[in-house]
Amino acid sequence: MATIEKKKSGTTDLTVGKPLFQILRFALPLVLGTLFQQLYSFADTVIVGRCLGTDALGAVGTTYSLNFLILGFVQGACVGFGIPAAETFGAKDKDGLQKYLLNGALLCLVLSVVFTVLTTLMAGPLLRLIHTPEQLYADAVLYIRIIFLGIPATVLYNYASSVLRALGDSRHPFYFLLVASVVNILLDYLFIVPLGMGVDGAALATVLSQLLSGELCAYWFFTRTAKLEGLSFRQPRTLLSAEHCKRLGY
């Protein structure tokens, strides 16, 4: 019965069955998810270029390097927080797993607040630093500031999906990302064409779709995965101990 429930929840036990098959089964959604994440930028590029013109397209393209640098760091940190969770889950250390999950969530909260404030305030100077053309500057600042204001949504998806993968479920984060990618395309079109928004519409569509994928991952974790694994976060836990911070930082 437990095995059936785990299959329904999407959890894969890599120690059961043929190793190569299980690894490929777990890794395929990761590869496909990486490809679909590119749809966010691709959808913005295509719809902005077709509907708003070359200057708007240039403004969005100018922000790519900053977007990649800042959000890439945030995503990497969130994925890193899932590593000790995976180790304790594999060791069947439920108490340690709960502590790492709570510590990781708290650090993600701090990370999202700090990066949101700093990057939003520094968006203009950073664009000047990379010599953004004057005719593109206003739209570029508007676009990247909205993206940076959406860092909490990025953190939510990447941490929640990292936790699900750490517990053996790589399929549902991919499913939720696929849904969010489709929603992003629809919102891009809605905001830019019928509603007449500019590059801010494209940025807002990206943030909202990322928020949707994060909420879906979090909902699945708390309603299915956490219950199945017998995890409870109601009892007080030791947060941010030196050992846990060191391992999370690693």
Model regions: which residues?
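Alpha-helical transmembrane segments of multi-pass membrane transporters/permeases
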Residues: 95, 108, 163-189, 200, ...
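Residue-level signal for short hydrophobic patches within transmembrane helices
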Residues: 16, 20-39, 43, 66, ...
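Small-residue-rich hydrophobic transmembrane alpha-helices
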Residues: 57-117, 154-173
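Generic alpha-helical transmembrane segments of integral inner-membrane proteins
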Residues: 31, 35, 39, 43, ...
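Short alpha-helical transmembrane segments in multi-pass integral membrane proteins
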Residues: 1-27, 85-150, 194-250
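Small-residue hotspots at the loop-to-helix junctions and early N-terminal turns
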Residues: 52-65, 144, 203
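Helix-terminus/linker motif at the lipid-water interface of multi-pass membrane proteins
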Residues: 35, 39-58, 127-134, 190-197, ...
